[in-house]
Amino acid sequence: MSFVKEFNALCDRFRDPKTRIEAERKLLEFRKSRNVLEQSINVVVSKNATGFAKFQATSVCRDVALESWMRIGTQKQNTIREHLITYVVTNYNDLEKFVSKQILHTVASFYKRAWTSL
């Protein structure tokens, strides 16, 4: 099973009150995984990801990137920011509004952090 399908399934379990606690634990584990930024961005830009999965992946990307902002370096900061803004601008009409708003909020947070880091 691809990671995007697994993440979709995890997000579905997160929305179900019966399986929410276990799914939340797995989402928290995902935030600590090795390639979390790359994986979360892959979910965001995937055509197979659900809107809720894209929303959650964007939240993970934002939180992890901001927590490790100085460690990830300027080049990676710029790459993530530009990749997300390009994606949302290119696909704006196809994205659910709550997803595009979350991505734009994340990009704005990254620009603000970069500006305050000067």
Predicted regions and their residues:
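Alpha-helical solenoid scaffolds in large eukaryotic transport, assembly, and signaling factors
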Residues: 1-118
